[in-house]
Design a protein with these regions (language model features):
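Active-site helix of classical SDR
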Residues: 41, 76-79
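Conserved mid-core segment of classical short-chain dehydrogenase/reductases
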Residues: 12-27, 69-72
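SDR active-site lid
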Residues: 93-176
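Residue(s) in the substrate-gating loop at a strand-loop-helix junction
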Residues: 60
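A short, exposed helix-loop element centered on a Lys and neighboring polar residues
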Residues: 41-42, 85
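Active-site-adjacent segment of SDR/Rossmann-fold oxidoreductases
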Residues: 65, 86-97
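Conserved hydrophobic beta-strands of the Rossmann-like cofactor-binding core
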Residues: 5-6, 55
């Protein structure tokens, strides 16, 4: 048998306002962040059943509260959340438990400032002339500079908290369904999620890039 399967692969994917994005941007994120998770979990399910094992899936707090500009990534993490909830309820009678790791912002390759600027610019360069006129390069550069400064303050460098959550999900006698990791996840994003949509929408659109 097999005690635990940990699904941890992930990419940030294409970044930019929704009008910039195309179907392939969403497909690319799903092809790494979601579909392999389903395939691996299904493939190892017989071994997990024989050991009353666990599936631990890397999601994100952005799988519970959306962040504009990252729609492909956010969509893939919402898919991970939904799949994990469905699997958890379905597999419980089979002796298999399913658990989610939901980090906030940590300093990783996905949140790397240089990489995020590159992803924004990569999408901007393919836009047609109408969208480039709506979103001039000067506005994009100003927005990405401001976003980088905010991300630098928001991101925690203590990734050991995420590792600790994995360890607990694997070894806890009574593991949680969700392990929310990081102060921003617990005290910013989940608070925003609990607010009425008109309030959270107002707060989030104040930091959005406007044409």
């Amino acid at each position: 048998g097999l005690w635990a399967v940990i699904n941890n692969a992930g990419i940030g994917g294409a970044a930019g306002p929704t009008p910039w994005l195309i179907t392939e941007d969403f497909r690319a994120a799903m092809n790494v962040n979601f579909f392999p998770l389903v395939e691996i979990s299904t493939r190892f399910l017989p071994l997990l059943e024989s050991a009353n094992g666990r599936i631990i899936n890397m999601a994100s707090v952005l799988g519970r509260f959306s962040f504009q500009g990252l729609a492909p990534y956010v969509s893939s993490k919402y898919a991970v959340e939904g799949m994990s909830d469905a699997y958890r309820r379905c597999l419980k009678p089979h002796g298999v438990s399913v658990h989610l790791i939901e980090p906030g912002f940590f300093k990783t390759n996905i949140t790397n400032i240089v990489e995020n600027k590159r992803r924004f610019m990569q999408v901007w360069t393919r836009l047609n002339s109408r969208l480039k006129n709506q979103y001039p390069l000067t506005i994009v550069q100003k927005y990405t500079a401001g976003l980088s400064a905010k991300m630098d303050k928001l991101c925690s460098s203590d990734v050991s908290k995420v590792v600790s959550a994995y360890e607990r999900a694997v070894t806890d006698l009574r593991p949680r369904a969700r392990y929310v990791v990081g102060y921003d996840a617990k005290y910013i994003f989940l608070v925003l999620q609990a607010l009425p949509e008109w309030i959270s929408d107002y707060l989030m659109t104040r930091v959005d890039m406007k044409p």
